[in-house]
Each structure stands twice: as C-alpha cells, then as structure tokens.
Regions:
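Soluble periplasmic/extracytoplasmic beta-strand elements of cell-envelope proteins
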Residues: 4, 13, 49, 92-94, ...
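Short, solvent-exposed loop/turn elements at domain surfaces
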Residues: 35-36, 58-61
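Short, surface-exposed secondary-structure junctions/capping segments
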Residues: 35-53
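N-terminal post-signal-peptidase region of extra-cytosolic proteins
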Residues: 1, 26-40, 73-79
Length: 160
C-alpha cells in the first residue's frame, strides 16, 4: 500500500499495491503552499515514508504536544482557553523524506521539520489549505487510515 497526497485537490488517497483505491479523504495542507525549506510553514513535496506511528490507543480528540499525549481531550472550551494552539489530535503519522537534498537532510528535512499526518478539531475545514505544514485529517478518518498503514508505508506528496 502507499499514500498519495494531492495538494491541489486537498485529498489523501490510500492505494493498494496494484493502484486500486482503498480509501480517499479530504484533507487540509499548508496555508503557505508547497515547499521543503525549514521554517517555511509549507507542506513538503516528494517521496516520503511513515517513519513512526504515534497514539495507537489514544481516544479520539486526544491532544498531543511534542508527540506526547497531554492528558487533555480537545473540546470547544479547551480551544477557547488556548486559541493560538496548533491542535494535533488523535493520532500522528510522522513523515520522513526519502530524497536527499529535496526533503531529507539539511534545511529541507521533513522529519526534522516535524511534518505529520494528524487529526484536527471537528471545526477544521477540510478540502481547503490551512495548516502550518502538516496534513490535517478528520479524527475518525485518521483512525481508519492509521489502522490500515504500517511504519515504512510510502507517501508521495504532489502539487497536482
């Protein structure tokens, strides 16, 4: 299986080894568009793998900071209390680039930029740009995807 993320369509498609579609989801990528530079706030293009899966047993809407569950569950009240927090919820699929000089090592390293596929608050609009570089998904859809992929699964992010 492998994942294709289309930035122009704002979709994530899970494909089987023969190219058949297993699942397709609306997502939200970076408000700053595509780019691989450190501190750009962009979603990196190119070939990646899922380096780590985090949060396998976490409840939906579990809040993560620094890839660790905080013990909080995201609610409208919590969001009002911390209006500037970038909400990383439910599960994390941590991406690592595989193309040296494009999205791996130096100032373009996807993993060192902490680029994830992660859950987001229910009020987050999908199908539109809006993240700080990560790929945002609906929590229930992320749980389904998380359960279908393994660490090492290839992820291709394209600007088409």
């Amino acid at each position: 299986m492998h994942i294709k993320i289309s930035m122009t369509q704002q979709t994530l498609t899970l494909l089987d080894n023969f190219g058949g579609i297993k699942a397709k989801y609306r997502i939200s990528t970076a408000a700053n568009g595509a780019g691989c530079q450190k501190n750009s706030g962009c979603t990196p293009l190119g070939n990646h793998i899922i380096r780590a899966k985090i949060g396998a047993d976490a409840a939906p809407n579990t809040v993560f900071v620094g890839r660790r569950a905080t013990g909080e569950i995201c609610t409208p009240a919590l969001m009002a209390q911390f209006p500037n927090r970038d909400w990383i919820l439910t599960r994390i699929l941590w991406l690592s680039g595989t193309e040296v000089g494009v999205n791996r090592l130096g100032n373009v390293d996807t993993m060192q930029r902490y680029i994830y596929i992660h859950g987001s608050p229910d009020c987050t609009e999908m199908g539109k740009i809006g993240s700080h570089g990560c790929v945002r998904m609906r929590n229930e859809e992320l749980i389904a995807l998380f359960d279908m992929v393994e660490a090492g699964t290839s992820v291709n992010i394209v600007n088409e």
